[in-house]
């Protein structure tokens, strides 16, 4: 969690009441400043990006004699970040840092480091952090601004780099909160090094670093993998006795999950009942953790009950929430209830998100109900839904399973278009099933075009080339092009 400090704004950087004025001006254009000045701010937030650089727009506002507040700048940068326009947000941060009238806070430094990593990569992020460490002016904030770099290592599972950074931070005396230790525990769990999680906890105890709720939850998960249920229960008892933390629904869910994985279903059910009593009536998050765990227990009554109660929480129910409850109902085998919930979602959705319909589509295909799947797919298209790679993957599996290969081939061609814009790739089994169909039907032209497409996408394999070579040999055709593709693929 990035540590926030109050930044000091000086001279013309007025910080009073600007946020409300900015929101008003961006919403209805009622700001009292000049149209040109107002437009310079709106230009930054243009959906397709500003026509001019962010720095020139900000400088124009300053040069025209108008005040720019830190609150104003932060509000704009947050909106840019929310829409994943990290490069524009970084331009703003760089401009702010170069202004003599702004004193950067810990929050600003950490945010800039995070944006550098997101925009330019880890190498530049590392260089910026090193610059902070060797700057006497910024050394005081570097102590709290290292987390984005550590989190980037964790996200990319860069164990050695994360360990080296932790060693450096320890030598500088920076490790005084549980946050970096929690990040290391996440990294070790993600890389399957559960014993090291326990070592991190021992290090925290040795250095008198307090554990927080996340520390205990990660520790319990690791103990389950290393030592079993008894060790997890010991950690949980220690947590209950730790007056600095409050045991909430998240820790009880962690404990329940351990019991489920270890086959102690009744213990898990009792823990989940206690967790239900601790749910926050102003936030849905906990409800869906419990819904998922009830589904793992095969308890469809628990899934439905929590789902209905979650509706009383204020705020719009998101597509992610619907995906969670639909997946849980499908997992418990209650397709009828899943269809009812899906109809409920369809009746209120503004934008048709195919990730929701894909849950039901996958259930139909797995149950061998291909006609239902096709009917649902048709309805999705009518409602304006745009199939994604997962939609086509599900349908291809269904069509291959019921030997409707022409439809599977059409779907694969749709997938070829999508693969130019995403990292997903179809399974080897589906790829080979279509190739084997071409061989069986002696469709050598289609097979050759198919393999060429796969070759361009880097998906051609030795079994695929062997199949095509067999077809060419059988048809007594030259295979120079095939050998050339194999050579390029180093096969």
Curated annotation (Swiss-Prot):
Keyword Repeat: yes
UniProt keywords, alphabetically: Repeat
UniProt GO MF annotations: mRNA binding
Keyword Mitochondrion: no
Renumbered ranges of PPR repeats: 69-99, 105-139, 142-176, 177-211, 212-246, 248-278, 283-313, 318-348, 353-387, 388-426
Signal peptide bounds: none
Family as reported in the entry's similarity comment: Belongs to the PPR family. P subfamily.
UniProt-recorded name of the protein: Pentatricopeptide repeat-containing protein At5g27460
Native species: Arabidopsis thaliana
């Amino acid at each position: 969690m990035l540590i926030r400090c109050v930044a000091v704004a000086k001279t013309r950087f007025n910080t009073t009441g600007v946020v409300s004025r900015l929101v008003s001006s961006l919403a209805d254009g009622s700001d009292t400043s000049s149209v040109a000045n107002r437009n310079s701010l709106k230009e930054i937030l243009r959906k397709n990006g500003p026509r001019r650089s962010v720095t020139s727009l900000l400088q124009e506002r300053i040069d025209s004699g108008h005040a720019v507040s830190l609150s104003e700048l932060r509000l704009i940068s947050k909106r840019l970040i929310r829409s994943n326009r990290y490069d524009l947000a970084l331009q703003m941060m760089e401009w702010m840092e170069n202004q003599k009238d702004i004193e950067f806070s810990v929050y600003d430094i950490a945010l800039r480091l995070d944006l550098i990593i997101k925009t330019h990569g880890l190498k530049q992020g590392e260089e910026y952090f090193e610059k902070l460490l060797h700057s006497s002016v910024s050394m005081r904030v570097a102590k709290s601004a290292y987390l984005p770099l550590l989190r980037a290592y964790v996200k990319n599972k860069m164990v050695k780099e994360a360990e080296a950074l932790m060693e450096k931070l320890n030598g500088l005396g920076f490790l005084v909160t549980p946050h970096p230790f929690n990040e290391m525990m996440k990294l070790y769990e993600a890389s399957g090094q559960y014993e090291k999680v326990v070592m991190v906890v021992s290090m925290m105890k040795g250095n008198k670093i307090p554990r927080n709720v996340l520390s205990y939850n990660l520790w319990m998960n690791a103990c389950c993998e290393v030592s079993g249920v008894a060790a997890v229960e010991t950690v949980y008892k220690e947590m209950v006795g730790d007056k600095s933390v409050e045991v909430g629904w998240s820790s009880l869910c962690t404990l329940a999950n351990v019991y489920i994985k270890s086959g102690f279903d009744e213990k898990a059910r009792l823990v989940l009942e206690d967790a239900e009593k601790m749910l926050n009536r102003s936030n849905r998050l906990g409800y869906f953790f419990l819904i998922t765990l009830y589904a793992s227990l095969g308890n469809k009554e628990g899934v439905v009950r929590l789902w209905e109660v979650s509706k009383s929480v204020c705020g719009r129910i998101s597509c992610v929430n619907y995906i969670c409850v639909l997946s849980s109902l499908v997992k418990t085998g209650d397709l009828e209830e899943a269809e009812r919930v899906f109809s409920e979602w369809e009746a209120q959705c503004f934008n048709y998100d195919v990730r929701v319909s894909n849950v039901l589509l996958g259930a139909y295909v797995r149950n061998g109900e291909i006609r239902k799947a096709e009917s649902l797919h048709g309805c999705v298209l009518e409602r304006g839904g745009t199939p994604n790679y997962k939609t086509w993957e599900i349908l291809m599996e269904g069509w291959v399973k019921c030997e409707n290969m022409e439809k599977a081939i059409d779907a694969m061609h749709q997938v070829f278009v999508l693969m130019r814009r995403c990292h997903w790739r179809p399974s080897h089994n589906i790829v080979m099933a279509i190739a084997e169909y071409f061989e069986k039907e002696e469709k050598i032209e289609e097979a050759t075009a198919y393999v060429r497409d796969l070759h361009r996408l880097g998906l051609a394999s030795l079994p695929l080339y062997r199949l095509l070579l067999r077809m060419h040999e059988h048809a007594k055709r030259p295979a120079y092009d095939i050998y050339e593709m194999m050579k390029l693929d180093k096969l």
